[in-house]
Amino acid sequence: MTLHQNDAILTPSDETTTVTSMNFLTFEDNYLAGQSPERKIIMTNKEKALALIGTFVSGDTAKAKELLATGYIQHNLAFGTGADAFVAAVEGLAQAPVKTTVNNIRAFEDGDKVFLQTVYNFAGAGEQVGFDVFRFDADGKIAEHWDNLADKAAPNPSGHTQIDGTLEKKDVDKEETRKIVAGFVGDVLRGENPDKLTSYYDGDKYIQHNTAIADGLSGLGAALEAMAKQGISMVYNKTHMVLADGDYALACSEGTFGGVPTTYYDLFRVENGFIAEHWDVMETLADKSTWANENGKF
């Protein structure tokens, strides 16, 4: 693995949530049901994001339209941009012979953004683990979306999957969490100060969910050595976002893997000032000739 120096820019839910046909009451719902408007249920941004991915299961195009800003910006390069394109995707999945399933594992919120870790199976095509980031506008509508997806894989050398592990989120200073993770990504993953590697870990205490790497700093070192022997380099060129909620932070970066343009979404849990646990999704960047929108991955 070659760690490459370059430029940089710099919640979970307590339970796994199976997203089905989520039914949050609007003003009109309450009114028609004979309830007082004052009893209207106000959705949080996290609930709105979960409701939106829930429309893949329910086929509820009206709900999708309600949640999305008209000028919705899509960064998943397999889909067109705009609210209409999203609604068309919901309609298409609803008509598929095999029902889509959506299983949210962790959900976080940071300012105007919500970030989710979810297992999808779109129309029976196979399970994929994904990270989604949604940006909300001033009116509370979902205005922009980024994501990274990878096929669900077998447990790694330490027996961990891409989604298991700690679910509890601690109420700690998210800015301190962001600072630690941003520092690690810059110093270690982008290679700006590689000698600081061990300072980010509490000895060998490190739970790893990457599909090919074992637990501990020792497991990471062994994996990097094996990659180097195979001539495989993993390069992080630029980090676009570091989102934090409690003791968790998600870093969204781009670079190359084995010389191929790749996007990296890395979720870290921080404990006592050290990186304690890591989940990730790597996705090969699609050739521009295949893009369904011109917004770019970031």
Q: What kind of region is each of these model predictions?
A:
Residues 2-8, 12-298:
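C-terminal and inter-domain tail/linker signature
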